[in-house]
Every structure is written in structure tokens, then in C-alpha cells.
Amino acid sequence: MIAQGPSNGPFGGAPGPHIDPAVAAVIFDDFFSIHKNSSDEVDWLISAIQGTNTVECKTQYNGSGGELVLTSGTTTGDGDHMQWHHVGFKPLETLGRDIWFAAMVALSHIGVELGVGLANQNTDFSDTGLTNGIYFHRATDGTTTARARDGGDDEDTEISDPLSSAGVYCELGFHVTSAIATFYVNGSRVAEASAEIPWGTPLGPFVGLVTGGDAARAVAVDWIKVIQLR
């Protein structure tokens, strides 16, 4: 089993770069196109948190296409939650069943609430909408938390705002072993969690945004990748 390439942060020790499906389950989306639906089993499911919002693939910040852009409506609180339709990744207290997650994200404006990571359901990511997950949460004032949530109980670690500059991509990721979740920003370890990991709960990758002002604001996603050893 070949070790993962130069991204040593959240993917350190992961299988790859060419992953044998007998070794691990993997989702990788580079967003040159998107299959989406509001209710059926078509890749990404979209739930409106509030308002009329858009989800599309276009060139946003990196100049070469292949970017997913979620744009809110123009009223404070407008936004979407987007999640993979099948929650197929399960944190396990079993050696050798590790999970690796990362996403490359950027904000069009710093006044955005953002959620990105793994969660148990396609619903409002803000406040108490999600009952189980492992993810990053960023409030509209920039307060950013590395969070493990189990049955609505949180283990939060506040970290420096990694998205304090609009239009700049940042890699947010984590590695979950049989005992601990370690969070990374641009490959550097920033937090750990162990008390509220939702052991045994099926999770799926998600991205969500809410605008913090009466203006359309967006989150761009260059790519998302999830791996779990079988």
C-alpha cells in the first residue's frame, strides 16, 4: 500500500495516490460538473436553509474551472446545505478503519457562516441542525471551531480563522483513527477531539453556507476528498 503524496496533513498515511477499491472506500469530486438533486439519490443533495440560493460549477478563483460555487440569496440568513446523498463513512473504534477528509474552500466575503466536513444528515448545519458529525464551523464574525458532535453534544476547539481573507483558498481537513480526530489547516495540525466522536454513525461529506448580511455571498470549493479503510 503506497503512502499518500505531498499533502502530509490530513492525508498523511492514507492509501494512494491510486487507491485499490478493495483497500478503501473513496469519494473525490473535482467539480468540473455536478450532479445535484433536492430529494433523490443523485450524488449531491441540496437543502435550502433559507431563501433562494444557487449551486453551480464555474471558474471562480483559480482560473482553470472545476470549482463548485454555492451562492446565497440577498437576505441575512439565506443559504444552502449540500451533502453527498449516501452517508457511507462511519467512525469506528476499530484499528485499521481510519477516515481521512479534506476540502479546498474559499469565501467571497468574510461575513459568511460556513460548515464543511462529515455529517449524518442533509439539514441546516448551523446551530443545532446537525446531531452527529466531524467538521469545521465558521461563524459570520470569523470565530472558527474544529468540532466533533455526538448526539447533539459538542467537543469544540476554537482555532484561528483560516478564511480571514476573501478569495483565498484554504485546505481544511481531518484524520480520524480508532481513538481520536486530528484537524488540519493547510497541512498543519490545529486541534484534536476524542470525547464526542460519533462512533458507529454513518456520515457523509457536506458543505454549507449562510450569508451574514443582506447581500449574496458565496463559498467556492475546488475539491473534496474522503477515504476510509475497509
Positions of predicted regions on the chain:
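Extracellular carbohydrate-recognition regions
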Residues: I2-A48
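Extracellular beta-strand elements of beta-rich domains used
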Residues: F31-F32, V221-V226
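Extracellular glycan-recognition surfaces and repeat-rich motifs
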Residues: S39-V69
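Secretory/extracellular carbohydrate-interaction modules
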Residues: S72-T144
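Short, aromatic/His-centered strand-loop micro-motif at the edge of beta-sheets
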Residues: R149-E171
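Localized edge beta-strand/strand-to-loop motifs within extracellular or lumenal beta-rich domains
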Residues: V168-T182
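Short strand-turn-strand beta-turns centered on an Asx-Gly dipeptide
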Residues: V185-S188
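Flexible glycan-contacting loops in extracellular carbohydrate-active proteins
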Residues: A193-W223
